[in-house]
């Protein structure tokens, strides 16, 4: 297993996202890729609803660096393809959504479902399998309530399983409440947060800035290794 990249924690409002976590249903430690708020402009005031942290498996850095190292933070932040590569990459992801204002499971699932279905229909990939996955997603959340400080947790397996769990006190359970086997849903939940129409532009900017820095470090480490094995000139 590759070493967890050295990253810092991120404070979003009163929510602290630690530098690394072991998600429910996973055997891996994932590092904090980025974090930010989700909010809406309501009557001229920006109202913050949730704080969102996105964690990535260690292999995300070398995998993404192949295509994206050397790009500026602005180039990454403005690139739809970059965030698609994060969403669809062959590495584990974990999303922690912590409430700032009270939220019901039905409120949350209705909005996420709407965003997922809209995305699938826009790219022509909405089938009966996705409809059933959304139904199960809504079922898992329908009776839940999330006072401020509670969290909805998603472990996104690259094999196509979405593990859903909840936390009332900031701790992470070892196992999930439910697992939905649908690759498109597994990706679409994260797409709804950091994709083209993602609900947290702040989390996207944070991801771009932190990954850009890690790509630079990755390139520097590769250069050092290359110099170690290069023959010494006579």
Curated annotation (Swiss-Prot):
Pathway(s) per entry: Secondary metabolite biosynthesis; flavonoid biosynthesis
Source taxon at top rank: Eukaryota
Keyword Isomerase found: yes
Broad class of enzyme this protein falls into: isomerase
Site label Important for catalytic activity, positions: 108
Molecular function, one GO term: chalcone isomerase activity
Binding locations of substrate: 50, 115, 192
InterPro entries xrefs: CFI, Chalcone_isomerase, Chalcone_isomerase_3-sand, Chalcone_isomerase_bundle_sf, Chalcone_isomerase_sf
Known EC number: 5.5.1.6
Gene Ontology biological-process annotations: flavonoid biosynthetic process
UniProt function note: Catalyzes the intramolecular cyclization of bicyclic chalcones into tricyclic (S)-flavanones. Responsible for the isomerization of 4,2',4',6'-tetrahydroxychalcone (also termed chalcone) into naringenin.
More about this protein: Part of the biosynthetic pathway for all classes of flavonoids, a large class of secondary plant metabolites, many of which are brightly colored.
Membership in a protein family: Belongs to the chalcone isomerase family.
Record protein name field: Chalcone--flavanone isomerase 1
